[in-house]
Amino acid sequence: MRTPYLLASACTASDPAARYHQAELAIWDELTGSLAEYPRIWRSPEEGAMVLAEEVDELWDEIRGNHIGRARAEASQVGAMALRFIADLYEPDGPGGAVERCRAAAAEQHDAMALVGPRGRQCASSHEAFGYLKREFDALWSAIRFDEPARPIAARVAAMAVRFIAEITTSSTAVAVSVR
């Protein structure tokens, strides 16, 4: 995985809005790489959700290990798979091919930014940010399970991945956790 956008979004001295744009670019890089490496369109919401679940689990593993740089990289993969969920399952015959399908999904993610995470403030820690992301993923799985619209929820998962990347740039204050 390439990380120039992840490095740029970690720069807290720059324009705060630029961090979100750089996070979106990191997700776009992951998405285009995924399309090149795995061009087959997903066949069901269940398939897409389980690919996304794998990335969510890998993100949690990095957070638990306090590997913030790697967690941000995993968050870009979560965002990419959430966008791919929309592009593959809801725009499979869209005009312009895969890139245009993905641009439509990215626009939905951008529009969902104000709907996710804590209102009026940044995420306090990687654990909190993951909690919000996991809540959106759980809502996605619930929508699939009960045959409800999943597309807008997938956009919310991607939007929360953007917030994770943009807002979690260093190791957060240690969170008390049980060690086994």
Write out the residue ranges for each language-model feature:
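Flexible "arm" and connector segments at domain edges
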Residues: 1-180
